[in-house]
Amino acid sequence: MWASWIPVLCLGVCLLLPPEPVGSEGAVPIPITCSTRGLDIRKEKADVLCPGGCPLEEFSVFGHIVYASVSSICGAAVHRGVIGHSGGPVRIYSLPGRENYSSVVANGIQSQMLSRWSASFTVTKGKSGTQEATGQAVSTAHPATGKRLKKTPEKKTGNKDCKADIAFLIDGSFNIGQRRFNLQKNFVGKVALMLGIGTEGPHVGLVQASEHPKIEFYLKNFTSAKDVLFAIKEVAFRGGNSNTGKALKHTAQKFFTADTGARKGIPKVVVVFIDGWPSDDIEEAGIVAREFGVNVFIVSVAKPIPEELGMVQDVAFVDKAVCRNNGFFSYHMPNWFGTTKYVKPLVQKLCTHEQMMCSKTCYNSVNIAFLIDGSSSVGESNFRLMLKFVSNIAKTFEISDIGAKIAAVQFTYDQRTEFSFTDYSTKENVLAVIRNISYMSGGTATGDAISFTVRNVFGPVRDSPNKNFLVIVTDGQSYDDVRGPAAAAHDAGITIFSVGVAWAPLDDLKDMASKPKESHAFFTREFTGLEPIVSDVIRGICRDFLESQQ
């Protein structure tokens, strides 16, 4: 029964018609905020009014044409071209959930991919009403009940003491089954909630291991615990073999990229849940993860009983997959029942950043100084080939103010610091400076140059956590002793790679190089032969770095 009746004159006959319900065609559009989501509108069809001037960061959009209900309505409307950034009326239609929401750039908005969601919506041009869009976000009336919704709260910053990018790699195999799969999701949800997810805290995503790995959602998809919990709940059981190794390798290689939300300088973590044992080899996947700087935690549940051990490819699979076999990265629960008491200890591990040893790699935790021969025997054109050699090594590393650092010194009888470790913190700037180094020309005093570099370049960073390397490139015999200065550099913890060209004596190269000499000293007859040595030096740096971390 309608609460009131409105007289309407039609062809001379006065009729009593009920007023249109809120949200129906012809009704005044309901004002909403920039971040109001499709799931906040609980009608099959509703007319809403989007404000103008919404910041793009409030437009969280998943899909194209058909959008997941967790998407911003106004963001979807701008994305589809229904309205512009000045706002306006929008009609929203509720649709069933689906799989594989696509990622598309449209009208200045990048929508995100989502593997599955329980409800969807689409948008069309709405009917204009008496309300007008403004640049101000307003409180919204709830279309289903007529109650006022609370103003959308600001995004939570999260636990700043637990900054980490975390992928939960859950077991979706027939090993675990549907019932224990749901218990696993509940446990992961509790861990996610306790972590303190937020814009400046931990970010999480989820991958399901089964016959083929499936990334359920990425780090960038959700930055609130509420949305993460909802997304975890929506993950469907896949079944198949527990190819955990395949899934771990896929996660290490594809999950932690800038495009998917990985942050610079933040520890990368994969928490692998294994019910029983994996169906494939997990050791190689662990090696790949370490090479990518990913900290692998293994949460094993229900160890195989003696009668099942013959079915396990490698009973030591946990020790071979984790970041370090020191007990910190492995975690065991007897079963999936009564797991609440295991949540806090796991969270404490995930938030202990000083233990995240695999975040440090040879690519982001080294200081590399290049000592470049600028003597007269080199010549301008060959000097440029030397600089190309230096650039090709430098560009391999993750140069930043918290990552790898590069310095360069040119020497003849004299020495000139081209740039120090603290001068440039981006790869682009470092490579540009190397290209523009001018050729000095003069004699060759390599010993003095080593002492100068140790004192003036490495001295200011002696307390740096990065491992120190010196790459010497020379084309001739030094007029001074190299043995003493090189030994002093070794004693100072600096690993030396010596690279000789043309007339450089092999004895000098070996005297300067760190041990074992055969893997730290290189020689080529021609300057064009420097290029193949690039990969040898990079491999050597990474090998020495890994050995120093054992």
UniProtKB/Swiss-Prot annotation:
GO terms for molecular function: collagen binding. It is found in: Secreted, Extracellular space. Residues 1-24 form the signal peptide. Residues 128-158 are annotated as: Disordered. Residues 165-350, 367-537 form the VWFA domain. Keywords: Disulfide bond, Glycoprotein, Repeat, Secreted, Signal. CDD domains: vWA_collagen, vWA_collagen_alphaI-XII-like. GO terms for cellular component: collagen-containing extracellular matrix; extracellular region. The keyword Repressor does not apply. It comes from the Eukaryota. Coiled coil: none annotated. Glycans are attached at residues 100, 221, 436. Disulfide bonds join 34-50, 54-74. Residues 28-121 form the LCCL domain. InterPro entries: ECM_Assembly_Org, LCCL, LCCL_sf, VWF_A, vWFA_dom_sf. Residues 128-139 have a biased composition (Polar residues). N-glycosylated. GO terms for biological process: regulation of cell shape. PANTHER family: COCHLIN, COLLAGEN ALPHA. Plays a role in the control of cell shape and motility in the trabecular meshwork. Monomer. May form homodimer. Interacts with type II collagen. Interacts with SLC44A2. Interacts with ANXA2. This is Cochlin.
